[in-house]
Each structure stands twice: as structure tokens, then as C-alpha cells.
Amino acid sequence: ERILVSGDNRHVSYNEPKAMQEYLVTHAVAPQDVVVDYAGRSTYETCMRAKDVFGLQRAVLVSQGYHLPRALYIANSLGLDSVGMAGDLRLKPKADYQSVREWAAEVKAFLNLKYFPPDVLLGDMKPIK
């Protein structure tokens, strides 16, 4: 089994996949078991790339609990058979910026999946074995 970490790294000071990789390696995951995707700029793109670049058919998505329903909706709608696991203990977001952002992201996910699929940087296949 391998772990695919994917996220945004468009800015020099912001590198989600590198931070995830470093965390896993410092917590006893062998470096060769961590596959890094630097082009997952959104949940939609991460799921498309997991399927179309890394050749995954099934996945366990690990994310914040409040984010999981949207991530699973996107992954399964794109044909990536997925289940989820919350990586935090926060049961419900507070009525703050994050919950407003998540609501907007849910609307965007629906529109992307039904009407306006975004361009996804795919590239060559790199199947995970």
C-alpha cells in the first residue's frame, strides 16, 4: 500500500504536499511509500489526477471532517471509488470563515461536476504500484 499526498504548491511559501510528506515520514511512514502530487490545486483536480495520472480506482480520503462529504462527493462522482476518514476531531465547523468557505466550495463542486468541469493538469501516467 502507498500513500498519495496531493495539494497546492503554487507559491514558494505554501507547499501542502511537501508538508504532508514530511509529517508522514517523521511519523514512521517509509519515504518510498509516500507518492507526492504537486499539481492537486483543488479537490477536484486531486481526484482526477489520482484516477487519470496515478491510475487509482479506489481510495481512502483523509481530510478534515467538515470537508469529507464534499471530497467524497467529488471523488465518487469522478469514478474514484472512495471512502473517507476524518483526520481531525473537530465534529462541526464553527460559524466562521471556514464554514462559509466550505459552503461556497460545495456549490462550486456541484457546478464543476454537472456543468463546468475545470481544466486539470494531467500529464503522463505515473501508476502507483
Regions found by a protein language model. Name each.
Residues 1-99:
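A structural signal for short, hydrophobic/glycine-enriched beta-strand patches
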Residues 96-122:
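A transmembrane-helix-recognition feature enriched in membrane-embedded lipid enzymes
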Residues 121-129:
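A short, charged, Gly/Pro-tolerant segment at domain boundaries
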